[in-house]
């Protein structure tokens, strides 16, 4: 039985050579956008500081995902790693620091289906935050990319 891999998010953040060129004190928000594209989420601090969060996930179906007669939806899921890179900006929009982390994430197929249905019905805060930030820095906002990123953000907050 072969495994089915899926990927979500920004593949660029896996590239250590590319990311190593991003230097604190030298990079502005528009420069980071040009290097890595639109972030998955944007969070603001109390003194106009902010952080841009980029995520990438690669996941494989578990053995239960292939169960016959629709049982895979009920008992199957995906196992994978989520790589997160967070870039911290000062109040002038200059990069101060960057961090990365990797965490394991299991997502059940049934929960994924539920999140997809909810995402089509609800408004999504991370998409709004990213859209607002793109307006502030004068860069285009990709709503389709934001919707895909929202699914990963939701998986991290609910599974």
Predicted regions and their residues:
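Residues within mature, well-folded domains
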Residues: 5-159
